[in-house]
């Protein structure tokens, strides 16, 4: 018997979000904010001046393929059953998605290879092991009784600054769950990693802010009280190192603080970015300066005529 869909899920799924008019409006994302905070000049070159740079890597290929495979597994798990989800050939699915995504990024990389078969095989085998552990302990990581899948890649579109109606923030949330008995929403951001996050990575506000921003904007768009929304990172490890003392898991859960202080900090950061980068007519006509630091050597504009700081 099919589960009855709670009214809150229907309301979220039927919500009509604003369409961006690219002739008169600008679209921003959290990645733009992150880049601007790292180096305003790099953001300006990429987004304002149109020198778009995207470097295809095995990590971006694996990240996309893994997300899509796990999201499909979770969709079947919640909308059908755990048994049906376990009957999926996720190994085959992951392999197909890795091939598809590699071909896609190969074409966008001017038909230049950026990995080799052995590396692709290694990432594939790592992904198979991660999904095997997740499926084995699925109720531990996701829960079943009383839980519903709101959806995967849930859209966020809104004007984050009331004085700049021409600037819209756009994003997608990896996984959103709803717990009917407590009326709670759970926002999950899936992160692929080499061997997990250490203390420094967990405390990195640049990582936290995107998830906290999604909590704030999900609340505003879908009319869910902030106190009813929980956020967490689901961090999956490609590599684990054996220990004689305890079992090392491939899955790590991190729940960052997302209360009033952090929410206000995120709001201020986004509003300041908009104020510095835009005006009511579009991009603000100012010269954004480079922020010179150790990361400059990794920048695609490093030692090019486009950046005076390193040329």
Where are these regions (language model features)?
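RecB-family 4Fe-4S metal-dependent nuclease core
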Residues: 1-311
């Amino acid at each position: 018997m099919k589960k009855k869909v709670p009214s809150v899920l229907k309301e979220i799924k039927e919500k009509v979000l604003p369409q961006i008019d690219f002739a008169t409006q600008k679209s921003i994302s959290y990645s733009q904010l992150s880049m601007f905070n790292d180096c305003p000049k790099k953001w300006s070159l990429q987004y304002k001046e149109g020198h778009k740079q995207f470097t295809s890597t095995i990590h971006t290929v694996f990240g996309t393929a893994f997300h899509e495979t796990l999201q499909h597994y979770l969709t079947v798990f919640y909308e059908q059953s755990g048994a049906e989800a376990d009957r999926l050939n996720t190994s085959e699915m992951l392999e197909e998605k890795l091939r598809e995504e590699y071909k896609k990024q190969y074409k966008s990389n001017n038909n230049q290879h950026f990995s080799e078969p052995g590396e692709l095989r290694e990432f594939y085998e790592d992904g198979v092991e991660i999904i095997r552990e997740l499926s084995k302990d699925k109720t531990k990581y996701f829960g079943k009784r009383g839980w519903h899948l709101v959806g995967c890649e849930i859209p966020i579109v809104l004007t984050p600054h009331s004085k700049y109606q021409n600037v819209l923030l756009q994003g997608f949330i990896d996984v959103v769950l709803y717990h009917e008995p407590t009326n709670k929403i759970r926002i999950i951001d899936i992160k692929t990693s080499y061997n997990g996050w250490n203390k420094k990575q967990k405390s990195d506000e640049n990582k936290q802010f995107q998830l906290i921003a999604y909590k704030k904007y999900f609340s505003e768009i879908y009319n869910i009280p902030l106190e009813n929304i929980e956020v967490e990172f689901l961090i999956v490890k490609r590599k684990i190192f054996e220990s004689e003392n305890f079992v090392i898991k491939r899955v790590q859960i991190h729940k960052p603080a997302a209360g009033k202080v952090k929410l206000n900090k995120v709001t201020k950061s986004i509003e300041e970015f908009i104020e510095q980068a835009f005006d009511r007519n579009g991009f603000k006509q100012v010269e954004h300066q480079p922020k010179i630091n150790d990361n400059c050597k990794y920048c695609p504009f490093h030692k090019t005529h486009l950046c005076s700081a390193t040329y």
